[in-house]
Amino acid sequence: MMDEDKDHTRGAELVAQMEGALNQAFDEISFEMGFNGEKHELILTPEGDKVKLFELIYFQKHAPKEVLEHWNILVGRQPLQNIGLRTENGLDISGDDVQIWLEEQGENSFAISAYCEKLLPMLREEEGRAWWMLTTLTDQVLGEIPHMRYIDSFDVLEEPKAEPSFLLSQLPDKLREQGLELSTDPEAYLESYLGYKMEPKQDPDADWRLDVMAGSTCCVPLDRKSVV
């Protein structure tokens, strides 16, 4: 169908068909489709959820070879130069339209504050939509995997800060200056782990997980759920 859609008029139909296929494997799934000049591309996005990332990689690694002859299946939005988004009223937003303030929170951990004058009307009327556009644009400028790996806090401002800022389009270079590797390999990201210690519960009726004294995890969100 994508090959036949030369005039790009069947986008909604294509998305619905792909969504129906993916919903056989996932309860909820966010994805994008494209064409790189040689193959069609299916980009599966975890939307910042590390638990979902494990699921998407499993799906990617088990794709039939017949499918991979015609499709590239990628996990995480890929960084693209000169990328931009368009609002429903036809307003184009690029990385050059967004001011960024970057604050170091810890080792390889940063907070972002973003200000975009073009999106102020949307921010006031459709705050969630404005947040989605700015976080998605950051994914596309930086790459979704580096975004998940290094940006632990994201704030959208209604007015700029007094401190000096830089453009969102410069964010990859700013992070490289910090010595960070901006790999888009999701498996490499999942190989990183966190060690922890805790006081074990002595109550014999406590949940099993609560008698652990020390451990490590590659998926902090899932580990937190197990101790709640």
Show where each model-derived region lies.
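Surface-exposed, low-hydrophobicity interaction/linker segments
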Residues: M1-I29, E187-D207
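Long, disordered, Ser/Thr/Pro-rich
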Residues: M1-K6, E38, R86-N89, M213, ...
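An N-terminal, globular interaction/scaffold subdomain
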Residues: T9-W71
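Generic structural motif
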Residues: I29-M33, I73, N89, V98-L102
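Short, flexible loop/turn elements at secondary-structure junctions
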Residues: P46-G48, V75-R77, C116
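Long, charge-dense
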Residues: P64-L85
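Long, hydrophobic alpha/beta structural blocks
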Residues: Q81, I93-C218
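Conserved small/polar residues in nucleotide/adenosyl-binding loops
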Residues: K225-V227
